[in-house]
Amino acid sequence: MDGTFYWHDYETTGVNPSIDRPLQFAGLRTDENLLPVGEPLTIFCKLPRDILPTPEACITTGITPQHTIREGLSERDFISQIYDQLSAPRTCGVGYNSINFDDEITRYTLYRNFYDPYLREWDQGNSRWDIIDMIRLTKALRPKGFEWPEKHTGEPSFKLEDLAEANKIQQGEAHEALSDVLTT
């Protein structure tokens, strides 16, 4: 297989990758021309009974512990499917604001389930890419062609949902993993 991009996103129980857990994962593989390769993957992770999501996470994502119990895979099966996708040879794992969050969620979940948390990032010609830095660079060096939303402070907002809305990109449901992947 030639090199591919694997666009992915998580929804989680909170905002701290070291203590919070994944609720949902979505990923879509594309070729180097950004044409889809195969079907998207959307899976839920069954929360252990001793883990509760923050109320904000439930409100933001719409995912409740009960939903994960009904629809979710065990964490071991959940991360196994993700690992298979991200560790396929010549895969570039791509996310939006992923270096400080999604990649960390992946690493902690891999570690808890006895996988090497870093191998998928470099083995077999693999790599990863957080495109938020590309968006920031575009704003700094060539801002024409995009509408740049601003926070109430007047600073630019690089939130995916704000950029999508300002540029009339149909996002679907913000903070639903597959919708965020397709928007990215």
Language-model features and meaning:
Residues 5-7:
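Short glycine-aspartate micro-motif
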Residues 10-18:
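Short acidic, Gly/Ser-rich segments with clustered Asp/Glu that frequently serve as metal-coordination loops
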